Amino acid sequence: MLLRFIAENIFSFKDAVEFNTFPSSKSQTHPHHKVDCSHATVLRLASLYGANGAGKSNLLAAIDLLHKAVLEGSLDKIGLYDNISFRFDQSLKNQPSGLAIEFFHAEKIFYYHIEFKKGEVLLEELYISKKTRDVEIFRRDGNKIHINEDYLPKGMSNEKYVDVLDRFIRPDMLLLSFFGHYYPNEIKVITDAFMWFVDSLRVVLPDTVSGYVPHLLDKHAPFRELVNDTMPELKTGISSLEVNKVPVSEETVQGNQAMIDAIREARKSPDTPQVVQRMTEAGVEIANIVFEDGQVWQKTLVSVREDARGHLYKAPISIESDGTQRLIEYMPLFFSVT
């Protein structure tokens, strides 16, 4: 059960923002709305409210990012190459982003926290939260790993154990996932925490914008005309939509396995777009990878807006609100019935 989630210096969050399921100390009614989780009392259900652009979707995206990172076991495998720190303060650009989650599972309250910059884990720690103190299970600070010897296999010292781990753990890898995937029987308490991400945590997001829209907008003139006639009338601030189209190859995306796989699939099926999700500084971006005219292209959507002086500027579609992205997503349906 999710108890608390904290995000800092990521997407639209500059300072640490917390979402939790703890009841207000002032509320003494509706006891059936609460449930005991070890020493903590939490709500069975919590909702998130806020104005358009307040960060609701980004909070869910941050939870989804952590979930995917743990399941995959690597920041590289989820395409986390670009800086996704808070984008409106340049002083934070080179500072790490942080995600922390507290949850109840296997009769224990766990606290898991990571800090990272681009594709490198800088800090990772797992604790068991008790009523009066927190018990460290492991802590990884840079390339220094410490595991609580109370949880190590009998006869194994922390120094010897960590020496072995250092040979396997790359900077992009998560220690929690390494144990969960490859050594689930080694340290049970770590496996318990990992299995909560596998079996219990589910993140349901709105269907991603784009899909095949970048390719359709690029190649189908009637659809492009309809979209750009309609968007200004919807009062979203967008004057038109364009496609950013750049050539890509396996050499230009070295290290990004998702892109490499998409390029190879695109070559097998010319003119059929492959959909790739990427993490960028602006947020989650959907790209179409298409092999056409003897070249592999990456196509992404950009919105064209007008500033206060009447100058046009372009921005990635990923910075638009969920509502605006949903409108764009419905454009193929709208086109099919007109």
Stretches with model-predicted labels:
Residues M1-N9, D218-V248, S269-I289:
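Amphipathic alpha-helical domain-onset/packing element
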Residues K14, N94-P96, E107-I109, K118-L122, ...:
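Coil-to-beta-strand transition motifs
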Residues K34-S47, A51, L60-V121:
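Conserved P-loop NTP-binding catalytic core
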Residues L45-L48, R264-F335:
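Conserved ABC ATPase signature
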